[in-house]
Amino acid sequence: MKLKKKAKMMIVLSIIANLLSGCGFGETKIEYERLVKALDEGDMKTVMSASDDGYAYLKEETSDSTYEEKEDGEHSRIIYQTTHGVYNVKEDDLYGKTTQKVATDIKNDKNVGSNQNYKKETVYSTNLKNEKSRSIAQNQGIDVSYVKIMFRGLNELSKLKPSEDTKRFSEPSIISYDLTELQFKSIINDKLNLKYDKFNSAILMIEFNTPNDTKENQMRIIQITIAVNYEEKKEDKLIKRNQEISTYYHTREDNNQSAKKEYVNYEKEYIN
C-alpha cells in the first residue's frame, strides 16, 4: 500500500514539474538553441555533423509543383530532384549525383480516384558539382537549377521563436517556424530566389535525433525542410505553386568512417 501511495505521489510530482516548466504532461521541451545558432552562423561542421576533417554526407529532395485550372480540370506538373553527395566544409563545395523526374496529371470530376492521366518520367541523371551555392552538371548542357543545397546558413533564424518546440511522447523531435513573408524574404528567399506575385505561407521544420543533449547522446540535426506556397501570374490569372526542399544529414560516425573517401570518388567521377 505504501508503495502504491509513493507511486501516485511521484506521478503527481511529475505532472506538477511539467506544468511548472511550461510543458504539458508527456511533453518535453526541445533544446534546439545550440544547433539553431550554428545554422544561423553558418557553422556547417556542426550543422551537418561533419567528420573530424570536415566532410559530410548529404541528401537533398526538392519538389516544385504547379497547379492550373483549365477547361478539362486541374493540370498539375511536379518536378522532383534528388541529390546525393558529400560536402566539404573547408572548400564550401559538394560533389555527387542528381536525378530529375517530372510527373504530370489532370484531375476532374470524371476521373476522381483514377490515375489514368498520371505520367512520370526520368528526365536525366548526372554527376554534379555544387560550389558556393552554384550547381554545375558534368554535362553543362543539363539544367540543374533545381538543386539548391541552400541551408549553408540561415541568418537571423536564432532570433525567431519557433511556433512549435515541444516533443510529445513518441513523436519525433521537430521544431517548426511559421514564417511571415518578411521573415521568408530575409531568412530563406535570399538563397532560394523565388519570384512570386502572391505569398501564401512558408514553414521551416528542423528535426533532431533527440530533444536534448546528454552525455551518452548528443543532439544533431537529422533533417531540415522548407515548404513554400505561393502564386504567380500567368496570362492575367494566378497559378498555384508549391516548393518543398528537404535536406538529410548522416551521423558524425558515418562521416568519419567514409565521407572523405566518397567525396574523392565523386570528384573523380565528375572530372572524368
Describe the role of every protein-language-model region:
Residues 137-219:
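Short helix-loop boundary/capping segments
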Residues 1-27:
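Sec-dependent N-terminal signal peptides of Gram-positive bacterial secreted proteins and lipoproteins
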Residues 62-90:
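Extracytoplasmic/periplasmic/luminal assembly and interaction segments
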Residues 21-66, 267-272:
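N-terminal leader/targeting segments and the immediate start of mature chains
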Residues 81-141:
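An acidic-aromatic
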Residues 185-266:
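Gly/Pro-enriched, hydrophobic low-complexity segments
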